[in-house]
Amino acid sequence: MHNVQDIYADEPIMLQFDLPKNGLIVVGDLHGDLYCLLNILLKNGFPPNAKYLFLGDYVDRGLYQVQLILFIFLMKLRWPNYITTLKGNHEDYQCGKEYDFYNECLSMFKRGSRWFTQINHVFDHMPVCAIISNQSIISHSDHFFVCHGGISQWMTCRSNVGNIPKPTYTSNMHFVEGVILADLLWADPKLEQQKWFDLSRRNCGYSFNRDALNIVLRALKVKTLIRGHEYYPGGTTRNFGDDTCYTVHSTTDHQELYDPFCKFLIASQ
């Protein structure tokens, strides 16, 4: 556990890297669905034959929460340059207590409370977003901004995001840094919303419309937002009907029957 935490501690809060020539497999919310993860890996290949980026929400709700997150940690240890994992809103101490990840740890381990605390220490060292360049395109802008939730009205430049401190204990942050972090983990796009930014129905973070997204994308010098956080029956969706915002949710809705066709997005040149 300490070894994988050390890897994350060396990574910046906002990753920046080039899009692989053979593409990048983007995996959305898994929520303890180990079968879904294995299906995606079997379909696309294990590293180093493929590179993966995970959008967060590995725990809570599913049947194999502990097994899934430990498996992802093992993959990160084995292939650190081929596995990128971002923090989601459920990778949080309080959220894990309110849902069922804490109880899963208690049932799995003799000292479950310690395991829960240690895993959350690892979560707090994870990066929360990434900027991905497409070197095959000559442009003054990078291609993708990737996070779990969405954008913030305070994201006026990249340094506003890159200066968020790790580990991500909000008590160690300035107010604006905490607000940006909350939006990165909790924000949602809303097609019919009139205001650029409005209070989220989730009681944390803000929702944003197309105009707000375009302004923030220009400020960050990127063209497309890729995010998770929301379930859609098709697994992926273009939130505004164009290429400015994609949502990826890999596991099925846990209120529905088991769906063997796990969803993912391939970001390619």
Identify the residue ranges that each predicted region occupies.
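Feature recognizes metal-dependent phosphohydrolase scaffolds
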Residues: 1-269
